[in-house]
Amino acid sequence: IWLTKDPLTYSKLGRKYLLKDLIKKFTAERLPILKASEEYRRILFWWSEQIGEIDIKDISPSTIDHLRNYLLRNRRISKSRVNRYTAVLSSLFTTAVREWQLMESNPCSKIKKFKEPEGRTRYLSNEERRRLLDACKMSRNKDLLLVVELAISSGMRKNEILTIRIRQIDFDNGWINIYETKNDNKRIIPISAALLKKFQLKIDREKLVADDFLFHSERDRARPRCIRVAFTNALKIAKVEDFRFHDLRHTTASYLAMSGVPIQTISRILGHKTIQMTMRYTHLNSAHLREAIQKISTVIVE
């Protein structure tokens, strides 16, 4: 789309560094080490289509804001998703400023995020969980059951699970090391003995080595496995409605909260940057604690 009736205003050819060239550089040098590389690729491609011909020094906050509003109104994308588009572009510009010295400042830093609605907390009931796991057992995708079991047991994100390499699994200590490239943090995810045993059997059976993906493509071991279609089919067979893979993460958090696990601990397990992100589960925590106290009270109080 053009931002004004005069396309030349926004097509400043002949300058030193066009946005599309910056995106190409970022795609080649940075994307391979990012967790959400495919999502980044799609979003950056969209930005390149819109303003790729503009010199990066001429991209202003108002230019970006105009396109944000276009996404929100014309494409009918949610505010949280529009914020994600802006965050990806901001990551690009931050790299250009701090690492490559190609820009003096990040124009996205002057843009205020859209206020997002409180996140949903859809989680599996016990019966839904049983049906879903049964459906996963019947799937033609032989990794699906273990992927879903790991997701519910750990609260890990989909991309974190599908990009686990064997070297990240610490069998001695019983955890998986997750490296967050974005902020250079490392998260430790405790893993049950039962899951570790399944991991070891899979590694031995498939003769996997340190740099192999635990869940790799059948055609190419250098690529993570795709489970989208298999998971969608399993949901249909299990008759679990209004559910996404990310809701398995909500399921983990909800189960922990209902078991009385402190919110601070849940926040650390999920890798939330702030405790506010975890506060949505407090009502589940307090309700089940109240129920536990009520059970004790009925025994003690006559």
Regions found by a protein language model. Give the residues of each.
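N-terminal DNA-binding recognition helix of tyrosine site-specific recombinases/integrases
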Residues: I43-W46, I54-H66, R73-I111, M156-N159
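C-terminal catalytic core of tyrosine-transesterase DNA break-rejoin enzymes
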Residues: R98, E149, S153-E160, R249-K273, ...
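Short, polar N-cap/turn motifs at the start of nucleic acid-interacting alpha helices
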Residues: Q168-W175, D242, V261-R280, E291
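C-terminal catalytic core of Y-nucleophile DNA break-rejoin enzymes
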Residues: T181-L201, A210-N233
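C-terminal secondary-structure termini that scaffold catalytic or DNA-interacting sites
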Residues: L201-R205, S217-R219, I296-E302
